[in-house]
């Protein structure tokens, strides 16, 4: 059986604002974008193999996304510091283990599991 692959779609109201957040503050790079009639509608951002598709095509769905992003745990303190330096608001949460929660400008949430998730075998 072949390897499965997914790219989650996050619905946003303002694609340019979302791209600035993910690229300038969260450290993603833009892989591609699609425009029609001079308006950007879809963009893909990526960082370390994590790919997200951002779209403003269905604004009524904006803010309803939740993405669980696993990092190498040794990277977590550095990632947190880089987010804080870039002005990203971080909330500490709990999902059976500590998580770091980041919310984009549209309310989509990114969950980053904490150190004890590996001990629980949930990474």
Report the location of each language-model feature:
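N-terminal beta-strand motif that seeds the catalytic metal site of vicinal oxygen chelate
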Residues: 1-19, 66-69, 116-123
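Core segments of cupin and vicinal oxygen chelate
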Residues: 2, 9-51
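Vicinal oxygen chelate
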Residues: 13-16, 67-109, 114
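A short linear hydrophobic-aromatic micro-motif
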Residues: 29-32, 54, 88-91
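Short acidic/glycine-enriched loop/turn segments that link adjacent beta-strands
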Residues: 37-41, 62-63, 95-98
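Short, charged/polar, Gly/Pro-enriched secondary-structure boundary elements
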Residues: 49-53, 107-110
């Amino acid at each position: 059986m072949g390897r499965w692959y997914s790219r989650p779609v996050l619905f946003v109201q303002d694609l340019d604002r979302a791209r600035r957040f993910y690229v300038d503050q969260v450290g993603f790079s833009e892989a591609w974008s699609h425009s029609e009639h001079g308006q950007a509608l879809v963009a893909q951002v990526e960082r370390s193999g994590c790919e997200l598709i951002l779209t403003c095509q269905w604004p009524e769905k904006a803010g309803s996304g939740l993405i669980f992003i696993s990092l190498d745990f040794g990277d977590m303190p550095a990632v947190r510091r880089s987010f804080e330096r870039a002005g990203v608001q971080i909330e500490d949460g709990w999902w059976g283990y500590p998580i770091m929660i980041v919310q984009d400008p549209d309310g989509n949430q990114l969950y980053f599991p904490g150190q004890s998730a590996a001990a629980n075998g949930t990474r």
